[in-house]
Amino acid sequence: NYFFKGPKGENGGDLLYIQGHSAPGIYARAFLEGRLTEKQLEKFRQEVEVDGLSSYPHPWLMNDFWQFPTVSMGLGPLQAIYQARFLKYLENRGLIKAEGRKVWAFLGDGEMDEPESVGALSIAAREKLDNLIFVVNCNLQRLDGPVRGNGKIIQELEGLFRGAGWNVIKVIWGGRWDPLFARDNQGWLQKRMEECLDGDYQSYKANDGSYVRQHFFNQYPELKKMVENMTDEEIWRLNRGGHDPQKVYAAYARAVEHKGTPTVILAKTIKGYGMGAAGEGQNITHQQKKMTIDQLKAFRDRFNIPVSDDKIADIPFYKPDDDSPEIKYLKKQREALGGYLPHRSIEVEQLKIPHLEEFSSITKGLGDREISTTMAFVRILSVLLKNKDISSRIVPIVPDECRTFGMEGLFRQIGIYSPVGQLYTPVDHEQVMYYREAVDGQILEEGINEAGAFCSWIAAATSYSSNKLAMIPFYIYYSMFGFQRIGDLAWAAGDMQARGFLLGGTAGRTTLAGEGLQHQDGHSHVLASTIPNCISYDPTYAYELAVIVQNGLYRMYEKQDNVFYYITIMNENYSHPDMPEGVEEGIIKGMYLLKENKKKSKNHVQLMGCGTILREVIKAAEMLEEDFSITSDIWSVTSFNELRKEGLAVERYNNMHPKNKPQQSYVTSQLKERPGPVIATTDYMRIYADQIRPFVPNRYITLGTDGYGRSDTRTQLRHFFEVDAKFIVLTALNALVAEGTLDKTKVVDAMKRYNINPDKLNPMTH
């Protein structure tokens, strides 16, 4: 009623990261406000065929209500830090006014054990995020038992936050303790409180006033005398600070006025508050689903809820009349503060997206010059940064890898964001591409911090809703340290309907040579396929990359599709041809015919490839024809994931519409008239290409890089993982033998010709 600014405020509303398990309380408040109906409350956790309410905050399920998913636990605090930082970034770049806006994160003390909860505290202080407020509900319990039964979680968190440079406000004891504190001139209360462990405090609230008198006050004569005139009921009602509205108000008021550093409020509470014998302060509270009639009556009486005994068994919802003083006041306060919360804006700004022609410097090919797709991406980014319509919206995000990816030229051009600018003279200041930090810098240089960098990407990718300002984030990183490292955050990004680009650099298990097992990515596209609204591509050529990026901009920022893009780019240099005519649709759909051999011998095969391995496929086609007089068609497959999605959609349509003429998947339509077996080779696990097997009308064999990576040259790695041109030829020959059109002696001949050892180590298990 007093602090949280709504979306109609002067500079926009506050951003609330609400503890997932408190969702029912938020729904109850929204019911009183008239935002939710009784029918909706009755359908809590029943969402499939009714207008129900999601279990936890999920924007995908309630897209105009919840802003941020905060489960699994730990995601909320990390996101909140980078959201507050992104508001400062936008403000310092002159894109928004954020004066007075706050980012609130409501957390649990048990949740603070998550590394994500505390791992970025120093960043918040270093960036001077005085627009950030954490409220930690310290009820001393987690699901199974005490958070720190043998210790004190509040003091532990206080030390942690103070050490990180935060402003700490503790709300420990409620107002009913104040008279006792006033009489305690010698500090006996403080002494006893410091002696008690959190396990003791849990026991006090799980029992009654007599127990508290005996085990807390009677330990010292001075304390025993202090409460000798208090009844057990009065002792029992000595409240904790987190349940005292006046104490909480005072803490919030102090927090919003604080300047210079982020603030944390540590509020001591009781888990199961109000449940009494049904679960207050007990270890079973989290699993308590029902209350007995007597327990319901006790709850009603404790909080003065006007429900009669004859109605109590129905557990009715209670809401004062709309013209009651309480509801009028509640609505008046929200109106004064700028509207209701939580609220997610679905009014989306539309950007003017450049046409593909503006990328002609990339799509026309590079002649004899050899570059990587990473460098092609940097060129595309440069084109976008020169576009007057969207250049200011571009947010390059890098976790200490700009030089790795050849992006250091952007340091001077657009600068690295720093809230204090550059207070030192960089060692390379006399060079053209020196390390330039600036208050209005555009690059978010995150250091070695993939989780934080991804949270910056989320903040930018959801700015169209949070700030009504569409931003276009490009986060480029080692592909192995993406979904595998921060998969939970990527899933949350999908839930939030994030829009932006993820660039998995140095991708491909055999393409990143020399760095070994933990760096070589052979499965990021497999992980990307698990997120329903993640659109992923593995392009080979610069023109494919340009088409994909331009289409992504169109889909996300003009068409307003709730998707985000994952694109793998490589560090292998090779030549990039001109874009063939009419391939744009195939690039976007996931495959197109790159080269057709119209001679077509008796034995003919279809060869598929993607990324850098497509070049091995092209080489294999030449070897097949030169060494065995076998012709082939070559397909560039930009996305097995997109082909699978389209195939499943067609399959479902046919299942659901048996009376209609069956549709054909795009894969089927492209291959149905093409003779010969299909061999698909990628730099990823075979399951990546296996996804389209149901839609391939021909015999289908896949090659991939299953197994652990290792350091060596690309040539050695590709032979080890059996994805080089020699193994593609061998596989094609075996497929023709299986078709009955080729004698197996040709396979034996090929193994001798290419020096393939039949007893070589199996890369899947070695």
Residue ranges of predicted features:
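Cofactor-binding active-site loop characterized by glycine-rich and histidine/acidic residues
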Residues: 1-127, 150-151, 407-410, 417, ...
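Generic, well-ordered alpha-helical scaffold segments in large soluble proteins
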Residues: 2, 29-32, 83-89, 120-123, ...
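Conserved internal helical-beta-strand scaffold that buttresses enzyme catalytic cores
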Residues: 2-5, 14, 20-23, 28-71, ...
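A short, small-residue-rich loop immediately preceding and capping a beta-strand
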Residues: 12-16, 66-69, 96-114, 132-134, ...
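Conserved short loop/turn motifs at secondary-structure junctions
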Residues: 14-15, 26, 107-110, 142, ...
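Thiamine diphosphate
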Residues: 46-69, 75, 79, 89-100, ...
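A structural-propensity feature for long, helix-poor, extended segments
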Residues: 105-108, 112, 488-509, 514
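Non-catalytic terminal/interface segments that mediate subunit docking, oligomerization
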Residues: 324-484, 489-499, 560-561, 582-603, ...
